[in-house]
Every structure is written in C-alpha cells, then in structure tokens.
C-alpha cells in the first residue's frame, strides 16, 4: 500500500476522480523541492472568474509563474483582472455558438483579429479526429481538416498578423482502439498527420503541437516528425494521457528524446476551469461535471500539477491519484471508472527540467510578447 492509499483512510470525504486517495493537494505542494525558475504552462483553458481564482491558488502553490490560456474572447479582460501579467492568451473559435459554419469560418477570422487586438499572438487550430463529427453536422465533412480551404484562410490571416500556431492532432491510441475504430470515418492515426505536414511546409512560423504532438506513445514517430519540420514544437499537456503513456516510456529513451529536441518540448497541463465546476453536478456536460464544489474544483486543477511534476521531476512509482476512464474504455471487464494507471516518475536531469518547465517556452514565446507590448506602446 503506498502513502496515498494510507491517506485515503484519513479523509475519505475528499475522494473524487481527481483525488482517488483523499489527499490534501495544498499540503502536498510543500513536499516538492523549490525550483530556481517559474514554470511556464503553455496549454490551458482558463475561464470563469470564480474558478480562475481557485486555479490561481493551485498554480501559485505548484510554482506556475505564467499561464497561456485558450480563454474565450469575451472573458479575456476578466482573466487579466484576476492574473495581471501572469496570463497570456491563445485565440480559439467560439465553440458555444449555434451557427457552427460561421463560427468555424468567417467568425473565427473575426475572433483571431479580436484576440490579436488584445495582445494575443498565438492561434489554436483544433483538428482532433472527432472534429469530423462537427464538420458533418455543418454539412461539409472536410471543413475541419487542418488543410481545408476554410482553415487555410484563417491561417493566412493569423500568419499575416505575425501569430504563431498551436494545433491538436490525433488523440490517444486508446481512442483509436475504441471511439475511432471505424477508420472509414476517422482515418487511421497516421492519417491525421498528412494535413499537418502539408501546413507545416506552407506556414513556416513556429507551430506547437499539443499533447506531445498527439502521439506520446510513439517517440520514434515524433523523432521523424520533428526532424522533418524544424518549425515544429511539442507541448506535454493532457495529464491523464501523459501519465499513462510517458510512464511507460523507458527513462533513458525519453531522456535521449528530450535531449535531442531540447528547446522544442514545452510544458503544458491542459487544465480546464469554468464556474460550472463550483455548482452541483446536475444535468451538466461532461467537462462541467468534473467538479461540483470549490474543494473538488481545487482538486481537479491541483491534481494535474501534482501529477505532472511527479512525472517529470521525481522517481515516484505508484498509482496515479487521478482516475483514468480510458482504462475501462479499453478493458471494461478489468477496470472501473475510478481505476488509474501507474505513475512512474522520470526524474529528469536538471538541465532538461529547466528547458521543459521554463527555458524552451521563454525562448520561443517571449519575443512574441515583447513585439505585442511594443505594438501596444506605439498605439498609445
């Protein structure tokens, strides 16, 4: 029995999918060694002013000095009031609108320009396999392809504004074994990368491919992708996915990969906040139902930072405190909704940790921010 299982006997009232062992994540933060640099989280979704303040506490406890967030355009100013200069923004479409064709097309271009006017210098192009479902509902199955004409129009606008790109390509191998088993609809996993490679060649500014480029299960593939495209960077966001798959990578092979591409691998969490996390879970959408009060919301946010820091900087070896439903999805006869994989820490050398947590993002993105600030000064 590990120390978390023992802790579960002390406070079972705290047990939830983000806290399988009922631990105090605020107290746990003090057990980490202080870092000589602030962590830069390049991938989050911070919305909701009340939830944002709970996230702010978790971020401060776990050493996050700067957060890049896919905040909805209408909430950018509210988030600035909470975080000041410790948050920067990534342009995204309006996902909640009723006119998807407009929101993914001309409406997205309008929002890119709106974000840019507020100092944002990164645009996110989401192209997960399930985006085909949105495209079909609009009436054009190809609309959400990364290289569709509509997407390229938006990319050209962002490019002309001097913005960098972020993208979501593919999804976990577990999803291709289950949700995406019908390749005639979703394509194979390798199929997802053909549009990306074409766009990397056309738009040569830096790209950040989220979630270890969508294939943390296959470092060999990522080696080739990064070699072919020097403008490509990866972030390490999506805690459950990274815990499950990075834990399985042999430490030496992972270190060799991170060493070879030092400066091109950026830390991210993919934490999602919303004020719905503070209300009882009745008739909520999946993302909103992940928490139903302030304590659960804090656990939801802090657990990701706890787990990711353990993964990268420690020799932790034990079950993850975060439930991973993918286990049950793949093997329902062997797993429950509350089961979790082993978290096997990789104890990265300090130079690689510094690059991952801070230096890579600072070197890549700080010049963009400086340009934004200079432009704002000139307009005054």
Question: What do the predicted segments below correspond to?
Answer:
Residues 1-86, 106, 296:
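An N-terminally biased module of ancient metal coordination in phosphate/nucleic-acid-related enzymes
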Residues 39-44, 66-69, 87-92, 123-125, ...:
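Hydrophobic faces of well-ordered beta-strands that scaffold small-molecule active sites
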Residues 45-52, 67-76, 96-107, 145, ...:
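Acidic-and-aromatic substrate-binding clefts and catalytic sites of carbohydrate-active enzymes
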Residues 73-189, 233, 238-240:
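Active-site gating/metal-coordination segments in enzymes
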Residues 6-8, 76-133, 248-267, 272-275, ...:
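Ligand-binding grooves and catalytic loops that recognize ribose/phosphate and carbohydrate rings
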Residues 206-208, 212-380:
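H/E-rich (His + Asp/Glu) clusters that bind or coordinate divalent metals
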Residues 52-54, 80, 101-102, 177-200, ...:
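Distinct, well-ordered alpha-helical segments
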Residues 31-33, 56-61, 75-88, 110-120, ...:
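Acidic (Asp/Glu)-rich catalytic clusters
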